[in-house]
Amino acid sequence: MNRQLKEIGAIPITTSIIESLYPELKSADKKVVWLEKNGYIIRLKRGLYVVNPEYSGKTLSNELIANHLYAPSYISMSTALRYYGLIPEAVYTHQSMTLKHSRSFQTPIGNYDYKYIARDAFSVGVRSMHKGEYAFLIASPEKAL
């Protein structure tokens, strides 16, 4: 029954996607609660989940999660600099820029911090990076500074 979840892999999914995977169920909320309680999915925030990597066999991407957790957004600041290997320090909070209000999230996967940036500066110097089977948005090294 959970073969569909394994196929999703590391991509964050919403409650409505889970509903579409199990159309035979009348109450998707109960299915979500059951999947979470039994460790098949991990809740990032209300309505957004990832398949547990122990179950899917796929490594989770903090970059991809950051892009989905508070969209529109892209990886920036020290997180981007660390991704490019420009700073030696470990990054414990994944930093991103967003068009929305600044906000922080603490999830079982990690901590995510979003800072507001004006619309006219948002897309300048942002690139799409491919990593394995997925892609995410990240600031160029120059913009991340």
What annotation goes with each model-predicted range?
Residues 1-72, 108:
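Short beta-edge/loop segments at beta->alpha junctions of small alpha/beta modules
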